[in-house]
Amino acid sequence: MSSAFDWRAKAACRDKDPELFFPVGNTGAAYQQIEEAKAVCRTCKVIDACLKCALDTNQDYGVWGGLSEDERRALKRRAMRARRSQAMQMQI
């Protein structure tokens, strides 16, 4: 049976300290930590699956799929606006 998390066995982060991907805050030292986590993500073969999982399961914290918490929130907002715009155009 396949799981939504099967991709994790191939993830570049699998042997890294998980705390690297969950900084506290988003400025100063936390910003540097976010950038270090993203650098690991950039080398990952399953970055897209990771991001999809984070979005599908509403992961609000940490770096997933190469995106920070703020970046994923912005991505969700853009997607929501695009869906609304498309729905409004279909009503016209």
From Swiss-Prot:
Residues in coiled coil: none
Record-level Gene Ontology MF annotations: 4 iron, 4 sulfur cluster binding; dinitrosyl-iron complex binding; DNA binding; metal ion binding; protein-disulfide reductase [NAD(P)H] activity
Swiss-Prot/TrEMBL cofactor(s): [4Fe-4S] cluster
SS bond partners: none
Keyword terms: 4Fe-4S, Cytoplasm, Disulfide bond, DNA-binding, Iron, Iron-sulfur, Metal-binding, Transcription, Transcription regulation
Major place of residence: cytoplasm
Domain 4Fe-4S Wbl-type: 12-74
Triggers of expression: Low level expression in exponential phase it increases about 8-fold by late stationary phase. Induced by heat (45 degrees Celsius) osmotic and oxidative stress, nutrient starvation, tetracycline, and bile salts.
InterPro entries the UniProt entry points to: 4FE4S_WBL (IPR034768), Whib (IPR003482)
Any one GO biological process: cell redox homeostasis
Cofactor binding mode and count: Binds 1 [4Fe-4S] cluster per subunit. Following nitrosylation of the [4Fe-4S] cluster binds 1 [4Fe-8(NO)] cluster per subunit.
Compartments, as annotated in UniProt: Cytoplasm
Keyword Ligase: no
Any one of the GO CC terms: cytoplasm
Annotated positions binding [4Fe-4S] cluster: 13, 41, 44, 50
PTM comment, free text: The Fe-S cluster can be nitrosylated by nitric oxide (NO). Upon Fe-S cluster removal intramolecular disulfide bonds are formed.
Family stated for the protein in its record: Belongs to the WhiB family.
Function: Acts as a transcriptional regulator. Probably redox-responsive. The apo- but not holo-form probably binds DNA.
Name of this chain's protein: Transcriptional regulator WhiB1
Species of provenance: Bifidobacterium longum (strain NCC 2705)
